[in-house]
């Protein structure tokens, strides 16, 4: 059963948005995902001193950054390395990749087809990601991109699939992004002004996610590969790796 537990899992930082814990989700075998192990988020470079004091309490061991190198150069890495986290950059989209995606699927915004295009950039990122997930020493993990919704959403959907969460839970977790959109747009508008070409409505749309995107993505993975686990097996993630991830992240 999917319940509305957003308030319990969302961490409301002043200068960082879409930051939440995936703990507590129930899985098909009756287990639940452990709290305080895996956080998903957007960029952290605008965190305030108050935010950073709170972030220390999370004791993040590994920061997995899914952004392109040019995004990192522009935005910086945020404070977690200084707080003791090991930093890993796994660029889901390489520099120039957004333009290639636009050519492949059209510049139609967030879509399942666009998410499927992430897989066409190669398997190395996904194999490395799940090997990181399989090492208990890497936890707690913070996984993020810029907005914490697309690259982070796809990665988290894969992980939730491996852990045995059903599609309703995966959909609901993905859509929780929309719960922090208004606060994020308020922050941008008040501190920087809206980007050129955007009004408040279009900015809200850009910062949010449509349910069709994750549904179409996972349907596409099912059609192409047989499902997320089948895709991950195909690229080299082993049964032993899956087992270690479940042992780390699931309650008994």
Regions found by a protein language model. Name each.
Residues 1-142, 154-252:
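Cys-dependent protein tyrosine phosphatase-like superfamily
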Residues 147, 151-152:
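Ser/Thr-glycine-rich phosphate-binding loops at phosphate-binding pockets of nucleotides
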